[in-house]
């Protein structure tokens, strides 16, 4: 068994993401029996000494039957209505499942915007930390009643990666109807040329020959979403296991199933992770070629002299994207000036600026190359 599977097996803090298809029958009916099976596997992991945070999809699916809908709704308003009804059923089901073990659950509803704003980000972190300290099981879900993009894309995959870093998890386990990563769709590959199972991914280069298809009709997150989220978490230093919910006992036990994504050797700091992945960019700075080299290759601070244009609406302390002359993003960072102020400084040497404007536009400590 690889060192990364060993790390997942021995992780003391784990985030488990459970997709919609893991909680429904093939016909789309919310299945409490499946949820109880998953709760049993998670309980076994917690009894072994791990803290577990659950990121659970399934609110919309759980709302279909109570609202007497015949299928998953297509329009946004009905999706949000189903989510508002289904979230109650979902959390009650988790509460009943863990109640068998005399455990209390706590509901945490988030959107990507909550994670992106530093104050809300810190509040969410404190809440999750406190729930764990009080030995409650945190059930995290996207707030589908107010979110829009989250309903259309991701099925909590990206959120789970963000939460894993938010709580300082030692491992992220993604459970759905997908048993791991293949270089093609195993359901469509011919018998004489079956899709090859990929046991371990060391980095993006290992995915060069992988063809990712679309997800199930019940969820919104397909393989593309899962790959993106797994690579995000791994890049931040968190090992990831992608496995089938049916294999949850093994995934949460000895981590012998599924595909493991190896983490980068050094864990990214919380601030750099927030700048790189979590924060919403409020604007864009366009850099000349010399500034791109200084920022990307030399890891130096960005000076106003290297900025040729600014766009968006930002203020000092906001996160902005740094783009080259071809409009390709090369970095993200925390800008030191308001847009109106920075616009008067473009292309000017530091020595030509007033003393109060001689700080870098983006300090090297607040820069993350992409």
Swiss-Prot record:
SUPFAM superfamilies: Carbamate kinase-like, PUA domain-like. Coiled coil: none annotated. Residues 282-360 form the PUA domain. Substrate binds at residues 57, 144, 156. The keyword Nucleotidyltransferase does not apply. GO terms for molecular function: ATP binding; glutamate 5-kinase activity; RNA binding. It is found in: Cytoplasm. SMART domains: PUA. Keywords: Amino-acid biosynthesis, ATP-binding, Cytoplasm, Kinase, Nucleotide-binding, Proline biosynthesis, Transferase. Pfam families: AA_kinase, PUA. It comes from the Bacteria. The keyword tRNA processing does not apply. Its main location: cytoplasm. It catalyses: L-glutamate + ATP = L-glutamyl 5-phosphate + ADP. GO terms for cellular component: cytosol. It is an enzyme of class 2 (transferase). Catalyzes the transfer of a phosphate group to glutamate to form L-glutamate 5-phosphate. Belongs to the glutamate 5-kinase family. HAMAP family: ProB. This is Glutamate 5-kinase. It comes from Mycolicibacterium gilvum (strain PYR-GCK) (Mycobacterium gilvum (strain PYR-GCK)).
